[in-house]
Amino acid sequence: MSNSGSLASLTNDFERFKRELPRDFPSHVRDTYRINLAARYLGRPLPHPIGKGSGQLSLNSGQLETDAEAGLAFAVLKTVIAQDAAGDQSMAAWAIHESKMKVERRGAGWTVTWKGRGWDRSFDEYLALVRTGWDLTRDGQLLTVPSVKYHLPRLEEPFRDAEYVFTTDALAKAWGESPLLLEKDFSPTLAGDQLSDEKAQILRWLREVPQRIRAHADVRLSMKLMNARFDDDFQHEMMEAASGADALVVFNRLFDATAGVAYGGQELSDRNLRVLDRPSARRPIGPSLSGTGNIHSGRMIVDYALRGCSSVQLHTFFQLPLEEYPATGGSRTQRALHALIFDPRDGLLAVMLEREAAGTLARRGGELHFLDLIGGN
């Protein structure tokens, strides 16, 4: 099929799938457009690059099952706060109930703000959610990844290893297969906390946390890096310090110290892409990257891919008012995927075909490959 023919088919599919997006849309895309959307996160193959970041949209089995049915590639579970065998949590200040999330416009885009932090239910309930996630992962329906906030000491203090031992071991047993896939969260509220006032303290965490987690289980580890309250150069120092991880999620939301809330929108993507644009952020070896921040279109997915990200994590775009999605049927996850993939102007397929026409993305074996975008700008 010619490039112009593909664009015509894309317009037809965009209209046709407004009512219902087929769950196995990556196969349809490959058959119809000869475009391979395969992506990767934490070394695991994905049918396409779009996943859901940790938060209020991944804290119960119903949400995970809806996402699996929609064809989402992966979901990171709500962040649990580590504890020791007695149930003590050094980071207990983060295990508080979330207030209602507020979805609002910010500039030309959208953001979600709320005052709340991590998992506020029992640890046993979290382990049950991990087991549900493992069932979906094992059956190939939805890759799920638990998320943890472990103890982070001040510079002169030791790590509370008892929390690392108990929490990691319990998660590994609930996961049921080696290696345990795990995301370590460095949250926006942490960035706004006094704990994060010192650069040396942050860099120590990033250097030492991976080995402390892996000391207690076979773990494939991703670290979700915060946007620290320092300059772009320090974001690069953080990436370098975190090189012991298997993957990095770049970068968590910004923190408004005055309002006491985290936020996203264009300010977030502008900073993230600017930091990732630097040559020092693109190393041929080291942790793989997963992009996050203001991802509201396939074009933005490509922007992150061109800067080295082999997958992306969204949160806000799955929460828009229903009338903001072009689709008229399906769950919010389905409607979001429909827009991100099939929008004939800014969807992922349209942008890949656009780059093919411009000579900046070539076919291999007759196909365009999403992963060929990585680091390609």
Predicted regions mapped to residue ranges:
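Metal-dependent enolase-superfamily TIM-barrel catalytic cores that perform enediolate-based chemistry
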Residues: 159-220, 226-227
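Conserved, mostly hydrophobic/aromatic
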Residues: 52, 75, 248, 279, ...
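N-terminal capping/small domains of soluble enzymes
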Residues: 1-169
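Glycine/Thr-rich beta-alpha phosphate-binding loop at enzyme active sites
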Residues: 24-33, 182-202, 233-285, 321-331
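Alpha-helix-loop-beta-strand connector modules within alpha/beta enzyme cores
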Residues: 100-106, 119-141, 198-221, 261-288, ...
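Alpha/beta catalytic cores of nucleotide-metabolism and tRNA/nucleoside-modifying enzymes
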Residues: 1-30, 101, 120-121, 267, ...
